[in-house]
């Protein structure tokens, strides 16, 4: 089939010649049965969802409990991001750095072009225009994903500002990121499809210089929804380096004091460290309120007043389901319950509702994420996959801040880094200054969980929680953070803090109750910004004493809180070789400023008790 005979190619709703020629080129290569330009309408969502139900990909859920919501069960081989198959194909290998997989871009293009040849036979090729961040932005970051997956089109409507409005923003010659995706499962004439098409061969490839994303073989999450990690972090971090801003793996939280003053806080945590829970915080301190602007990604640019302003480039939440419940995150549960949600790899109850580990109640019988019968206390495997997801519109969140769609963004007062550490790292620490803050972010360590590849319990260094998401060399990335500070008025920069909700006592109990009680730590952070709270100077930064925290009404042992705040110099001296090993791994591009901070920390710890 030539491009001239592929239905839909000649009825494109745009005159953008760059887009049209790319669409034609991809259609000739991949040989779909037809081409459809996605418009992002509700009608399209309903039509494609019904199509997915007919195909066996979607199960429509109980409309009384989850209106207009669906469950998809993936192929068991296609359940998560695949870091081992993710590549940064910069022109020079040094520009990808030691944390990324690299292949020569011309070799990768040749290899993947061969994979793409004929890969959409028997399928529809969808052209999906989208915008990351508010459509009204001065410099909107536009993209077009070409995909052969209806699941992707439906999910992109939830996760991005997708469709006709984004296409119109491109005009006749506007720049856009080219994002090409195929599940890699062509259908021959008469061949029956499967509910979740994918391929054993997978590549998720980024070309930072040309701002392109090529993905093949996976239909799942961040591998296939190319506006998410691929564009919003890997490609956007390269854009941010070139344009003088930050694209970060951060939530954006609005805290409102009893005096009705708002503070905006960005926070970077690795997976399974409570990012979504903090983004949707329900403060336990009387008079304090919280609203959310995002739970995963923040783009921060300097405003005219010299402060950093953040926007959330996403339009929906793509959250991990297990562990989400009415205690840990009631606002996420309310958002999901409003409907219009796509669940992936959770379990199905007998009355058409969803269930996962951590939810209240113990259903006696379920259909598990593999489509098998599951019985309470009899089946040994989990009912939901540990990385199962909900994809739900942000606009449904009951505590969504009114500024969530403001193209100007919100001024950030504090940046938090955090990890999961049983020992050593106190509940909260304030950095000495911006460069020291960059150092504690760049050396962030977190114990591994089921959400990350590697041995559970090992401390993995995860700079700014961006280890899998940096679109260029980690040393250059950290230097860019230092340069952001050098090129601005430090008095206008956010204060930097490090938090650890997960410290345990000798009896292995958590020392801090967490969840809504984390508002007490957030209050201390705000009071430090306002120069109203005390703290103790330690070799690692300023740490509150028990008396510095507002613990009124807290059901916790003060001795536990004191232990959670403790800075043990010997434990930190034992941490130094682990940090040094990580800095050596960064290699020749390690910024001098980070080496200086490490030497200064060693010096401060030398004589500390």
UniProtKB/Swiss-Prot annotation:
Catalytic site positions: 273
Binding site for Mn(2+): 229, 249, 296
Class of the enzyme per the UniProt entry, highest EC level: lyase
Pathway as given in its UniProt record: Carbohydrate biosynthesis; gluconeogenesis
InterPro entries: PEP_carboxykin_GTP_CS, PEP_carboxykinase_C, PEP_carboxykinase_GTP, PEP_carboxykinase_GTP_C, PEP_carboxykinase_GTP_N, PEP_carboxykinase_N
UniProt keyword annotation of Nucleotide-binding present: yes
Binding site for substrate: 81, 220-222, 271, 387-389
One GO CC term, this protein: cytosol
Catalytic activity field: oxaloacetate + GTP = phosphoenolpyruvate + GDP + CO2
Cysteines engaged in disulfide bonds, as pairs: none
Subunit structure: Monomer.
Record's protein name: Phosphoenolpyruvate carboxykinase [GTP]
Origin organism lineage: Bacteria, Bacillati, Actinomycetota, Actinomycetes, Mycobacteriales
């Amino acid at each position: 089939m030539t491009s001239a005979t592929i239905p839909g190619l000649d009825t494109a709703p745009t005159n953008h010649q760059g887009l049209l020629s790319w669409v034609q080129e991809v259609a000739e290569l991949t040989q779909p049965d037809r081409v459809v330009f996605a418009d992002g309408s509700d009608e399209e969502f309903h039509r494609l969802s019904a199509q997915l139900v007919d195909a066996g990909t979607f199960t429509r859920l109980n409309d009384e409990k989850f209106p207009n919501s669906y469950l998809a069960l993936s192929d068991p081989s296609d359940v998560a991001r695949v870091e081992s198959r993710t590549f940064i194909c910069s022109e020079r290998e040094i520009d990808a750095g030691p944390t990324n997989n690299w292949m020569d871009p011309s070799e990768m293009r040749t290899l993947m072009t061969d994979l793409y040849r004929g890969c959409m036979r028997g399928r529809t090729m969808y052209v999906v225009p989208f915008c990351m961040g508010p459509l009204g932005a001065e410099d909107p970051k536009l993209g077009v994903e070409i995909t052969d997956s209806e699941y992707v089109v439906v999910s992109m409507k939830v996760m991005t500002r997708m469709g006709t409005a984004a296409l119109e923003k491109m005009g006749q010659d506007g720049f856009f990121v080219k994002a090409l995706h195929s599940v890699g499962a062509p259908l021959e004439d008469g061949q029956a499809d499967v509910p979740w098409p994918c391929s054993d061969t997978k590549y998720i490839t980024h070309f930072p210089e040309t701002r392109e994303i090529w993905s093949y073989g996976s239909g799942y999450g961040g591998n296939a929804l190319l506006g998410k990690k691929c564009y919003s972090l890997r490609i956007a971090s390269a854009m941010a380096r070139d344009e003088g801003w930050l694209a970060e793996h951060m939530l954006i939280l609005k805290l409102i004091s009893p005096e009705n003053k708002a503070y905006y806080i960005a926070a970077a945590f690795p997976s399974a460290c409570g990012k979504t829970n903090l983004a949707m915080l329900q403060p336990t301190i009387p008079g304090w309120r919280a609203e959310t602007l995002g739970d995963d990604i923040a783009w921060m640019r300097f405003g005219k007043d010299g402060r950093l302003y953040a926007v959330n480039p996403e339009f929906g939440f793509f959250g991990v389901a297990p562990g989400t419940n009415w205690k840990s995150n009631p606002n996420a549960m309310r958002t999901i319950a409003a409907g219009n949600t796509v669940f992936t790899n959770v379990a199905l109850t007998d009355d058409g509702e969803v269930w996962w580990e951590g939810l209240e109640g113990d259903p006696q019988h379920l259909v598990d994420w593999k489509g098998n019968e599951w019985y309470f206390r009899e089946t040994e495997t989990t009912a939901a996959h540990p990385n199962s997801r909900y994809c739900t519109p942000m606009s449904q969140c009951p505590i969504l801040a009114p500024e969530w769609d403001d193209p100007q963004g919100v001024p950030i007062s504090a940046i938090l880094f955090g990890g999961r550490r049983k020992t050593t790292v106190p509940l909260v620490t304030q950095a000495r200054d911006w460069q020291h803050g960059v150092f504690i972010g760049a050396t962030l360590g977190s114990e591994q969980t089921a959400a990350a590849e590697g041995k559970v319990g090992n401390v993995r260094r995860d700079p700014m929680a961006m280890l899998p998401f940096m679109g260029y060399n980690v040393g250059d990335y950290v230097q860019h953070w230092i340069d952001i500070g050098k090129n601005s008025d430090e008095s206008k920069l956010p204060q930097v803090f490090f938090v650890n909700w997960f410290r345990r006592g000798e009896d292995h109990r958590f020392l801090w109750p967490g969840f809504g009680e984390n508002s007490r730590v957030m209050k201390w952070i705000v009071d430090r910004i306002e120069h109203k709270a005390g703290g103790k100077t330690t070799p690692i930064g300023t740490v509150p004493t028990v008396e510095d925290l507002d613990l009124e009404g807290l059901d916790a042992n003060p001795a536990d809180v004191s232990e959670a705040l403790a800075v043990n110099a010997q434990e930190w001296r034992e941490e130094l070789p682990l940090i040094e090993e990580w800095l050596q791994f960064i290699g020749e591009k390690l910024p001098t400023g980070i080496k200086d901070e490490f030497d200064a920390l060693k010096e401060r710890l030398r004589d500390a008790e």
